[in-house]
């Protein structure tokens, strides 16, 4: 199986997530970035015969015609606790209250921005993982994928 996995922890830093939210408000930058993402999708789909994307608007803006879309959600306080624990492991100097405030602010900004506001993609399967850990969430998503696209069962 040939694949590329990209999991750069810097992409999830507070600095990057705040910048991403700010950049998403600018329609010219937003249009340019979405076009780059869509071009990458076409190239990678041809090379690997499929692609899995992750992001706040992948299913609604970047790849709205995807075969299968998920909308992962969790309670704000649960998300803040998870992010705070991640930062503690990385020895970041930040409080839970700061993380909670940052997430709350980003949610409001992303849901209320003029261009491409954050929303549940049309046709997406909603998975609320407030009560599930990472492994449980992966298993839930995999089971849904296999039930909707059985031919993938032996490929993932």
Where do the language-model regions lie?
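C-terminal accessory "lid"/substrate-recognition subdomains
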Residues: 34, 97, 106-121, 142-156
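Short, flexible turn/loop "capping" segments at secondary-structure junctions
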Residues: 11-15, 61-63, 117-121
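ATP-dependent NMP and nucleoside kinases share a basic, alpha-helical "lid"
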Residues: 24, 28-90
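Conserved hydrophobic residues forming the short capping helix/wall of the S-adenosyl-L-methionine
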Residues: 87, 137, 145, 149
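ATP-dependent small-molecule kinase phosphotransfer cores
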Residues: 1-49, 98-114, 125, 134, ...
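Anionic, Ser/Thr-rich low-complexity intrinsically disordered regions
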Residues: 56-64, 71, 75-81, 90-115, ...
